[in-house]
Amino acid sequence: MTMGDDLWGWQNINGSPYLTCALLAPWPHAFFTRAFYPQLPEQLITYLDPQGKAFRVKQVHGDVTLTATEIGQTPLAPDSTHPPADGIISDAPHQGVWVASADCTPVLIGDLIGKRVAAIHAGWRGTKARIVPKTIDKFLALGSELKDLRVALGPAIAGEVYQVDPWVALEVGQSVQAVQKLATEEQQWDHLSTMVNPPVLPDAEPEKYRLDVRRINQLQLLELGFAQEQIAVAPHCTFQMEELFFSYRRTHTKEVQWSGIVSY
């Protein structure tokens, strides 16, 4: 994964590393690493904006994005102090929006003109359900313009190591409109595995494939009309970079790293 590698840079707080993306330079933001565990957004936001308020949700691998105001108006998830959703959009200054991840893709978005920001949790289920395009639709409904948005797809499990069943690869791939329009599954498989930077890769194990979920999200954005220059894809793999990131696929434990962005 090479596109936009130069847009990503390491920063540190008291020797603990975190990532930032040049596309999101106007906003305080961070893709925090495992070094910050077990700190929660309420603490992490103080590093980005001491005046900021943290907003988070109970992530459920769905396709719902709430505004910060809607978070306070939405019933809580069972056994949680937060409502169920997988995306948050700010609707006032100094709002930090946060997502947790440990292989799924953390997506941070900023609107250069409208000033609003978003954080999205996009695993394979949310990607299949097109949570990122649905969040973009919500930006547009709030008055944003596509050309003003900047999107960073943060550290996640890389396609080269993410083994999945065939039905998962195909159903996630079918969330790309160009794939969905093809008449047969054979044509869809061919498109997904032979296009430039293919999101579906072969696996040494029979009846298994490798799936690049970030690439699927990138393709969804490009189909909406985003320019390549509006999207940055992190060249970091949570599974392979054990010293920096938690990975559920690697350890099957529940530690997470947080990613957040603050409106201004």
From Swiss-Prot:
It holds the Pfam family Cu-oxidase_4. It catalyses: adenosine + phosphate = alpha-D-ribose 1-phosphate + adenine; S-methyl-5'-thioadenosine + phosphate = 5-(methylsulfanyl)-alpha-D-ribose 1-phosphate + adenine; inosine + phosphate = alpha-D-ribose 1-phosphate + hypoxanthine; adenosine + H2O + H(+) = inosine + NH4(+). Its EC number is 2.4.2.1, 3.5.4.4, 2.4.2.28. GO terms for molecular function: adenosine deaminase activity; copper ion binding; oxidoreductase activity; S-methyl-5-thioadenosine phosphorylase activity. Zn(2+) binds at residues 61, 104, 121. Its cofactor is Cu(2+); Zn(2+). Keywords: Copper, Hydrolase, Metal-binding, Oxidoreductase, Transferase, Zinc. InterPro entries: Cu_polyphenol_OxRdtase, Cu_polyphenol_OxRdtase_sf, Cytotoxic_necrot_fac-like_cat. Purine nucleoside enzyme that catalyzes the phosphorolysis of adenosine and inosine nucleosides, yielding D-ribose 1-phosphate and the respective free bases, adenine and hypoxanthine. Also catalyzes the phosphorolysis of S-methyl-5'-thioadenosine into adenine and S-methyl-5-thio-alpha-D-ribose 1-phosphate. Also has adenosine deaminase activity. Homodimer. Belongs to the purine nucleoside phosphorylase YfiH/LACC1 family. This is Purine nucleoside phosphorylase slr1573. It comes from Synechocystis sp. (strain ATCC 27184 / PCC 6803 / Kazusa).
